[in-house]
């Protein structure tokens, strides 16, 4: 800040402090001995409020252990956090990284339909379920 701007800033700060203290004292009983402390507290609060906010460095995005494109293979799905290969990621994410599938997708900017299970494993489970009759209506017994 230049000296002119700094001087104007200090004058404005003093005026605001005086207005706030005057308004407070007009509605509250303040002993004379506490008045300098009140003025100093109000001035300090205003000075801190007008100080520029600290600049926060942008957060760098984490780098995945493997590329997102290579993480989904037919027989396995690779964890972007640690690089481990799994048939199903959901339990691994919760136990080792404390992440839900939604948190994992959000952290790595993955689409909502990003699989948590290897495609071949999902197909095998689906085929097995159909073979044992899951998903079909039960047949009624004749009475």
From Swiss-Prot:
GO MF assignments: DNA binding; zinc ion binding
Any GO BP annotation: regulation of DNA-templated transcription
Zinc fingers (C2H3-type) by residue: 79-97
Record keywords: Activator, DNA-binding, Metal-binding, Plasmid, Repressor, Transcription, Transcription regulation, Zinc, Zinc-finger
Keyword Metal-binding found: yes
Cross-referenced Pfam families: ROS_MUCR
Entry function: Could be involved in the regulation of exopolysaccharide synthesis.
Annotated family: Belongs to the ros/MucR family.
Name used for this protein in its record: Transcriptional regulatory protein MucR homolog
Annotated source species: Sinorhizobium fredii (strain NBRC 101917 / NGR234)
